[in-house]
Amino acid sequence: MKQIAAILTEYRHYSHADVIVGKFLKGFPTDEGMRPARVRIASMYVDQFPAADMSRDMASAYNVPIFGSIRQALTLGGDSLAVDGVLIIGEHGDYPWNELEQHLYPRKYFMEQVCGVFAQSGRAVPVFNDKHLSYNWADARWMYDRARQLGAPYMAGSSLPLGYRSPWVEHALDTPLREAVAIGYSGLDVYGFHALETLQCMVERRIGGETGVAAVTCLEGDAVWQAARAGRWSRQLAEAATAQIPGVAGVPLEEVLLGPAVFLIEYRDGFRGAVLMCVEREGGFETFGYAARVGGDGGSEVQACEVFLGGDPHPHFSYLSLNVEEMFVTGKPSYPVERTLLTTGILEAALISRHRGHVRVETPHLDVTYRSYESVPWRPTGPRPVGASATPWA
């Protein structure tokens, strides 16, 4: 059984470490039942131990040593790389925020330490980086390039691409997409990333594949609705997305998207995307949606869905983790890391736009090109969790 090192900022109840590492330790709840792990968590490095820390108890229960450095976790206390894969979960913990309201998690530092062990050992193993690569483009690009330089299979990103779509929408490769909108909620840094990945995992499947992003603008408040009236994002698509969401179908967008913000994304091939955020969660909605205008010169149709994330036991993280495990077992990423490289850069550009007074930010550096997956090994296909996916863990 392959041995995996878990490199964590902190491990407490419902943290990302809990809902990811916990499944590698206890098994993966899926709609078809519990699936035992095919790999073993062999070591942990934990950066912080809050009062609600779970890492020590879980490590003791599953006989996993916690090491005092990332190098030791990867070498199992020896002199060279001794594991077959690395989970980097740099989410949650007591870290500062900057003037862009980005949470300064040490993901680049974690990756730098991991890659140092790879370089010193003369070989690399697969790495998964939870959520966006870093809070800034320079670090994210370094992480991506360093993994490629060392030959490390690399995955990253949100669990949203593995969420429950209702109704099921999955564009075929080379679909003629004209325009798309994703809807999300909560903070622009912490959850705006999830909404961006909801959008990007869909629109990367358009004709010609992904070409990169030319410019990004962030708007807030009444400027969001003014932009809709000016045709800068499609109200029709946003309404199509909310029409699929129980409780808000038919409700005016102004009553759904409280404290609104929008990311206007201009792709290099002329495609337009938008991410709408309900920033004020009190009284607003708390889910995700997607809609696109699909069709060539002969006409078009709107395709839309809700993207639902279940509560305890958080099955969307099961499907995310199963795809990561697939990479650990096969050595092949389940979907392209370039998606998350691009969404990392889009998010930074949006927050820069906001900080500078909601100006348009040109992004010539986001010339990220790639082709989407043929298929994803593990994912739900129903509208809601069932079976083990809907059974809370004790």
Where are these predicted regions, by residue range?
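Short amphipathic alpha-helix with an adjacent loop that forms part of the alpha/beta core around
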Residues: A73-L81, W168-H171
